[in-house]
Amino acid sequence: YRRQRQMCIRDRRRASLMVKRLFDIVVASIMLAVLALPMLIIAILIKCDSRGPVFFRQERVTQYGRIFKIYKFRTMVVNANELGASVTVDNDRRITRMGKLLRKIRADEFPQLFNILAGDMTLVGTRPEVPEYVKQYSKEMYATLLLPAGLTSRTSIAYKDEDKILGNAANPDKAYVEEVLPAKMKYNLEALRKFGFAEDCRVLWDTFESVVGSERLSVTK
């Protein structure tokens, strides 16, 4: 009986992963079609605003520890990694004028829709970390690499103002590894236990509300 139950759970999880992948492809394709013109305008504005490429590419870690190149719209000056911490802090001088706007409305993440279509990422899942931070994972944290890295998650919503938290730290990189990362992983590990299509839909809706809600608040202020 136990073996049959395990096989049933495994088959159910496999089916959930197939539905998740199909959902990723459909939604990412629709979003890219809708955002094609806005993304073109953003690309032009980035080139007009500061010197450097339109896209920022960086090595990140996804499912089973595989390294991939993540794509974002560039929001910082060229060689920003050589000018400061690996993480971004509040009022970071490396961020460009256009970059501040893109980060505020999360539009810098749009190019990751291509990562999703390529199968490197999923719509909802643990945000991908750089290899140097993954090396700091505890054994429990490695469980988050059982699924593809995500565009958004409960953690992303809870820590959308992460840069402000790190802005008060004397050593942002150290504060991230020792304080922020373990706290974020609690959300990520809990998300693994709640894994399912319905939960993914709720996270996507909550992400939309979080971004739109923060914009309404800033307009009101």
Across the structure, where does each feature detected by a protein language model lie?
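Short acidic-aromatic low-complexity motifs
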Residues: 103-112
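Single conserved hydrophobic/aromatic residue that forms the stacking wall/gate
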Residues: 1-11
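A hydrophobic, helix-centered structural microdomain
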Residues: 13-78, 191-221
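Hydrophobic structural segments characteristic of membrane proteins
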Residues: 53, 114-221
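Polar-ligand-bearing catalytic/cofactor-coordination segments
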Residues: 98
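Short, glycine-rich, amphipathic interfacial segments at transmembrane boundaries or analogous
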Residues: 56-94, 155-182, 186
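Juxtamembrane loop-helix boundary motifs flanking transmembrane segments in multi-pass membrane proteins
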Residues: 10, 14-18, 90-94, 109, ...
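Active-site His/Glu-centered metal-binding helix of metallohydrolases
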Residues: 8, 22, 26, 117
